[in-house]
A protein has these predicted regions:
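Glycine/small-residue-rich phosphate/adenosyl-binding loop
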Residues: 43-45, 51
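Poly-acidic low-complexity segments
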Residues: 29-31, 53, 57
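Divalent metal-coordination and catalytic microenvironments
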Residues: 13, 48, 72, 101
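Short glycine-enriched loops at secondary-structure junctions
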Residues: 50-55, 75-78, 104-105
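Catalytic core of membrane glycerolipid acyltransferases/transacylases, capturing the structured
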Residues: 46, 55-72
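Terminal alpha-helical anchor/extension segments at protein ends
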Residues: 1, 8, 51, 58-62
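Divalent-metal-activated hydrolytic enzyme cores
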Residues: 1-43, 66-67, 76-95, 108-139
């Protein structure tokens, strides 16, 4: 069950996504006063865990302004210790009531992991190890 606060924030994101899909985004939070206040503190209303793919930009997809979302981006949405700690910071310190997991089609990391499975280059191990359970159907 979702809290009333989280539902309210989810509705904002859904409305923003509707604006994006319809090609009618609204300009938000770009005035100098807002930018200056954001230099002092942040008060996002949602945390979005997203792939680092350059085509997936949560602020644009949800038609949000600067400071409205706490965005954690990582290739393949691979959740490791740093990602977990970032999300925990958003929830415990910034008190965001809503966590969104934003995936996408045609993920290059997932394709690469699938092509290399079970062999993987050492420098990709931490990312690919976290997506292999998904490829195996165990995640």
């Amino acid at each position: 069950m979702i809290s009333q606060t989280a539902q309210k924030e989810l509705n904002k994101l859904l409305e923003g996504n509707k604006n994006f899909i319809e090609g009618k985004p609204t300009a938000k939070n770009m005035c100098l006063k807002t930018l200056q206040s954001l230099a002092l503190y942040q008060e996002p209303y949602a945390c979005v865990l997203s792939c680092s793919d350059s085509r997936v930009v949560p602020e644009i997809i949800f038609d949000c302004g600067i400071g409205e979302l706490f965005v954690v981006r990582v290739a393949g949405i691979a959740v490791g210790p740093n990602v977990k700690e970032s999300i925990e910071y958003a929830v415990k310190k910034l008190h965001v009531p809503l966590l969104i997991l934003l995936g996408h089609d045609d993920c290059g990391v997932m394709k690469y992991a699938n092509e290399q499975y079970p062999e993987m280059p050492e420098h990709f191990q931490s990312i690919l190890k976290s997506v292999y359970p998904v490829i195996d159907g165990k995640g």
